[in-house]
Amino acid sequence: MHRDGKPQGFFYLDHRTVDGKCNIITDVYVTPGNINDATPYVERIITQMEKFNFEPEAVSADAGYNTSVICKEVYDLGLVGVFGYRRAPSQKGKFSKSKFRYIPEWDVYICPQRCYLEYKTTNRDGYKEYKAQKQICSQCPQRESCLTSKQEGKMLQRHIWEDYKDLFRTFALSDEGKAIYKRRKETIERSFADSKELHGLRYCHMRGIDSVREQCLLTAAVQNMKKIALVKSRRNTKRKTSRNDRGRSIFLRTTSEFSLFGQMKTQKENPSGFVSVLMVSGLQRPFLFLE
């Protein structure tokens, strides 16, 4: 495995899914370390929807899964994706791609000097190429901050499905999107932290992917048993202490209820101040966190 900020060596990756309500592990999928995180993502969502008859409203993951292809496939499943933000790579001292504004009506980019980068072609990898005129770039006062010594004109690439990525990015910046992403660190991040610190998943105890898969599955089973016991214990305690809260959720106390795709928002009074969970027509439906 060769990744920035990660140790180099032979590793396995545990692609885990938890529900956003109780932090129950719903899927464990182990791959070699040279497999990109985004490769099995949508496949694991579909597998769980078919196997457990899940009807999630949204999925959330870190920036490693924030690709145009995944956003398109998640959208086609009728889901909303809330992913971490990944900045486009740029050279030190040079303008990043965020400095160039895309105008969808004209299908052009506008540079900081208000010059157009027009569409030229689409390459075999599915990226549209936008180029500025060489004559304009050669006379630009900010040429040193924009081009390298080998470039004669500015060129940008945009994936053909980039619009889906922009759509999910807009939702992630909304109040609903922020609440979902905030919940992510309390679920999937906590689940992995417990696995490493309390259950020995920081290291492989056996060789081979089959043995590692067995270790990951057993670890997930133990964590789920502990979580289920804790949830049932809280439910029994809650029933004893309050007879007036039977209609409320036994897993999370919420400050508000919200749903996606144009559903109306409704507010609930609650002094506890826990984050929101997805609601549809008054019934809780899950959203998934994959890592």
Each predicted region: which residue ranges?
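Anion-binding and metal-coordination hotspots
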Residues: 1-291
